[in-house]
Amino acid sequence: MEIISLNVVPQCSVVTWSSKLATKRLVPNRSSLLFSGVKKSRLVIRSGNSDGYVVGENDDLGRIARRGESTSKVLIPGLPDESNGEIAARISHSHCEWKPKLRVHYEKAGCDNLDAPAVLFLPGFGVGSFHYEKQLTDLGRDYRVWAIDFLGQGLSLPTEDPTTMTEETSSSEDKEPFWGFGDKTEPWADQLVFSLDLWRDQVQYFVEEVIGEPVYIAGNSLGGYVALYFAATHPHLVKGVTLLNATPFWGFFPNPVRSPKLARLFPWPGAFPLPERVKKITELVWQKISDPESIAEILKQVYTDHSINVDKVFSRIVEVTQHPAAAASFASIMLAPGGELSFSEALSRCKENNVQICLMYGREDPWVRPLWGKKIKKEIPNAPYYEISPAGHCPHDEVPEVVNYLMRGWIKHLESGGFEALPLLEDTEEDWEESRIGREIEFPRDGWKKAVNLWLYGSNYTYWRGVRESFRSSFIRVFGGKSA
């Protein structure tokens, strides 16, 4: 890591990493470094004057750079670039059969790192293990890394139709085009509901039977909820939880264990077969949301940086929507009951069991805004809370260099028993407990230099202070940088 600190007394910190970068263009009047060859570099803090290359000048770090006040730049490695001779971890695909006809698809990398910590990634809604390719190829060089597809999503969809047609229906000319739209449930699919409780149990099986030891578990959006839920109910299987813009709510219907009387008021709990009315609604909704144009629009919403190539993610999502079980699985997911524990209850349970939690949130997420991450920070003050800008709902795919840098640093911090400093605290004497630390993070990507802003919020940084600062930042953006 290298920190270039402006107008401050230089200190020294040494971190080594390999890099090979051919810069296509150096921007005039901007600090740039050109690396050539694959070699070990000693990176230290440097002081000097610079105009500060900041992406997103409307935020706090952008205003600091324009005013010429003190700010810092942290240089981190990019993703492994095989075209430049760097070695990326190889990804392999596998399946395991949890229950009859229910195969769990997963990807893994770095399994030759026998003594390294185990890391498990859980996907968000509508995607799968493929969404963590940039973590598998990079973090897989140092750790043993897995990413799974939740049942009912990705490549963990049913391998057979969970329903059958009656003789009367099957003989009619108008046969259902989708699996799961039959009249009778197959024995193996009896009481099958793609719910939070099912996914929690799926993760338990995977950790116990496939990985075989406690893991560092990370989840984005829905995957974050499942990761926290799993850690709350199985803390002995978890070494730490990373929440990547985790959704704090899922399941709109009452859980039958938690609220049995209330649950009976809702006749269909998301199991197969789908009721006739649900079939008709599902067909209409599915026709819209599975349309490639709709998928492209959703990706445009959740990715802040529209220069990022999401073609591979787009094609994988479209591919999954064409599976015959996709529509019925979608209906089951959307109408499934909530979990036995709410997000807040799972968080409290993790706090009671001293489960280590780290928060990494994209600041420009239009769905799970950083406000939710700051509420978690309020409940667990000692949890490191990192905010990245510009980054949206999927920071692990939009700015994987930053997320991987934070993941490595956090795991090292825990593995060392706290001896290794958290990311951004390696070379600072700032009183970060009462405030927040902001840095400009620069990294190579596709031969160019790219920069984002990163903040670490202190343990005593209050929730309401964060709300006030967010309001102030929005106010300044609206009124053109004028302070109130």
Swiss-Prot record:
Inactivation phenotype: Stay-green phenotype during leaf senescence. Delayed chlorophyll breakdown during developmental senescence.
GO BP, sorted A to Z: chlorophyll catabolic process
Function: Alpha/beta hydrolase dephytylating specifically the Mg-free chlorophyll pigment (pheophytin), yielding pheophorbide. No activity on chlorophyll. Belongs to the chlorophyll catabolic enzymes (CCEs).
Enzyme class: hydrolase
Transit peptide limits: 1-47
Subcellular location as annotated: Plastid, Chloroplast thylakoid membrane; Plastid, Chloroplast stroma
Source organism per UniProt: Arabidopsis thaliana (Mouse-ear cress)
E.C. code: 3.1.1.-
GO molecular function: pheophytinase activity
Oligomeric and partner information: Interacts with HCAR, RCCR, PAO and the LHCII complex. Part of a SGR1-CCE-LHCII complex, which acts in chlorophyll breakdown.
The entry's keywords: Chlorophyll catabolism, Chloroplast, Hydrolase, Membrane, Plastid, Thylakoid, Transit peptide
Xref: Gene3D superfamilies: alpha/beta hydrolase
GO CC term (a single one): chloroplast stroma
Temperature dependence: Optimum temperature is 25-30 degrees Celsius.
Family of the protein in this entry: Belongs to the AB hydrolase superfamily.
Name listed for the protein in its UniProt record: Pheophytinase, chloroplastic
Keyword Repeat set for record: no
